[in-house]
Amino acid sequence: MAEIEQSMIDEMKDGFPLFDNKGDGKIDGAQLGDVLRSFGLNPSNAEVEKIAKANEGKRLSFDDYLAIHKQVLGQGEVGSYEDFFEGLKLFDKEGTGLISGAELRHVLATLGEKLTEAQVDELMAGGGGQEDAEGNVNYDTFAKYLMLG
């Protein structure tokens, strides 16, 4: 299980009561995604659904939550620039460093952790996803943009 610095545990302990809607020092299992994200984690929707289902109908103490937080923390890191670059490069059939903006939108909306149309629009409108005059996106720039967070 991943280790968490004591200062972070103290910070989470201070913030935990904000999610306690019954005043019993516990949170609903259905709130786990929100609580995890508020304390700096970014679990996938699939991870949140799995955890929420396992804790459906339960009220979780801070210690219960902390164990789940450590579990999610230890499940992996965000991909590296190289991971994103190599993944996007697969769609560059001509080896030009460009992929179709429409194809990129399709990939973002349908593969892996599927994004909504609004999320895709937000990513594409950002600095890295802008299409050139021919509707192509430089995937090196896009991968770098993704790594900026």
Swiss-Prot record:
Q: Does the keyword Hydrolase apply?
A: no
UniProt-recorded name of the protein:
Myosin, essential light chain
Signal sequence, renumbered to the chain:
none
Record keywords = Motor protein, Myosin, Repeat
Q: Does the keyword Transferase apply?
A: no
Q: Which residues form the EF-hand domain?
A: 7-42, 79-114
Query: Quaternary form?
Result: Myosin is a hexamer of 2 heavy chains and 4 light chains (two regulatory light chains and two essential light chains).
Q: Which domain of life is it from?
A: Eukaryota
**GO CC term (a single one):** myosin II complex
Q: Which GO terms describe its molecular function?
A: calcium ion binding
